Amino acid sequence: MAKLHITTWGCQMNEYDSSKMADLLNSTHGLELTDKPEEADVLLLNTCSIREKAQEKVFSQLGRWKNWKKDKPDLIIGVGGCVASQEGEHIRDRAPFVDIVFGPQTLHRLPEMINKIRGGDRAIVDISFPEIEKFDRLPEPRAEGPTAFVSIMEGCNKYCSFCVVPYTRGEEVSRPVDDVLFEIAQLAEQGVREVNLLGQNVNAYRGETFDGGICTFAELLRLVAAIDGIDRVRYTTSHPIEFTDDIIEVYRDTPELVSFLHLPIQSGADRVLTMMKRNHTALEYKAIIRKLREVRPNIQISSDFIVGFPGETAEDFEQTMKVIEQVNFDMSFSFIYSARPGTPAADLPDDISEEEKKARLARLQQRINHQAMQFSRAMLGTEQRVLVEGPSKKDIMELTGRTENNRIVNFQGTPDMIGKFVDIKITDVYTNSLRGEVVRTEDEMGLRVVESAASVIARTRKEDDLGVGKYVVNL
């Protein structure tokens, strides 16, 4: 059987895209996924342009693959993702042995591209933005365990001064709500218990309904939570300026929505936030967190931070450290600023030394790690509901799973627990994981069973006095 290897860099959206590519090419060309690139007949590199020197990293990887192409002339090499979208034809200028260059919105065309290359075409570059067509042509979802990612939208309209996403993935496009619910219902039928809704800015979701109306993100969350079998709902990533009160209300009345939120602030200094074009202040961000904790007192927050943004002063950084303490972040993805070509911030003078940037990053991460450990220690002796994912990586005789607040828990259990929930008493706390003992299995929990996605959709379809259909969410 012909084999496919995909190297994936970057965000969860890229991981989702790579899984869809693998499923698609398996169904159309019978390509079997392999983790050994030297065995592959098709090599795909799914790239990320967020970090510094992303382009050079791509060409370095392609250089290693070039030699395999000499030994195997029929080997097809493709480059996708955000660097492909940014660089386009330039990739083939520097690496003419690359057969296919495709963007995040054209991965669904890979079967046709491969057929054309096998039919004698020299090379194909397709980095267009065909909007929702991508989702219409992907294969049915396939569960790989009790958790799954589901893309609900793509792109971003915010144009933060440091970010390439609007240029590489396009502007915001939301999937129709029925399509999202149907995909999640299919996954639930395959045993998925937790879904993570994906998008560059999920709270901007505005999906079309069956009657031509619009479903907001808050409404979508309630609909997803009502699907039979789905007992946990997560989402990533969101933007503070669209974190509206209706979303906060979902935290009040929807227990399936986890008490853990990733809401990036990037900086705690208003001056820096203005230069970043974030369109909110630190006070406005903290107001969102305050309202969230009024309805979910135990919610834990993670964030992204950019350290050393052009013009960031020592006082600006102290403001960031102050916000970290005030919000009491649990986790963070924090990076030293690196200019992305084509973004407005790339034209700003980089006036901070590398030594200072590294010192600030180390101090920030140390503070976040300290706070995270405090949260973990507070869990000692408590009972935590854990979704069992499979054997532990540290000891195959044990099981591992995750808590609602994303902590890894290792424990002794039986194989029939995999894919189900167990209540664990936490007995030990480590830097990157917890350990505990089973006190309750899922059969003893009495988890609710509501209804299928189809019945949710049918129940929310209403008509007005004129007999015109309208979409009502009343769960």
UniProtKB/Swiss-Prot annotation:
Top-level taxon in the UniProt lineage: Bacteria
Coiled coil: none
PROSITE patterns: MTTASE_N (PS51449), MTTASE_RADICAL (PS01278), RADICAL_SAM (PS51918), TRAM (PS50926)
Radical SAM core domain mapped to chain residues: 142-374
TRAM domain ranges (all copies): 377-440
Any one GO MF annotation of this record: metal ion binding
Catalytic activity: N(6)-dimethylallyladenosine(37) in tRNA + (sulfur carrier)-SH + AH2 + 2 S-adenosyl-L-methionine = 2-methylsulfanyl-N(6)-dimethylallyladenosine(37) in tRNA + (sulfur carrier)-H + 5'-deoxyadenosine + L-methionine + A + S-adenosyl-L-homocysteine + 2 H(+)
Annotated MTTase N-terminal domain residues: 2-119
Record keywords: 4Fe-4S, Cytoplasm, Iron, Iron-sulfur, Metal-binding, S-adenosyl-L-methionine, Transferase, tRNA processing
Cofactor: [4Fe-4S] cluster
Gene Ontology, cellular component aspect: cytosol
The protein's assembly and partners: Monomer.
PANTHER family: CDK5 REGULATORY SUBUNIT-ASSOCIATED PROTEIN 1, MITOCHONDRIAL TRNA METHYLTHIOTRANSFERASE CDK5RAP1
Protein role: Catalyzes the methylthiolation of N6-(dimethylallyl)adenosine (i(6)A), leading to the formation of 2-methylthio-N6-(dimethylallyl)adenosine (ms(2)i(6)A) at position 37 in tRNAs that read codons beginning with uridine.
Protein name (database record): tRNA-2-methylthio-N(6)-dimethylallyladenosine synthase
Native organism: Actinobacillus pleuropneumoniae serotype 3 (strain JL03)
Source taxonomy: Bacteria, Pseudomonadati, Pseudomonadota, Gammaproteobacteria, Pasteurellales
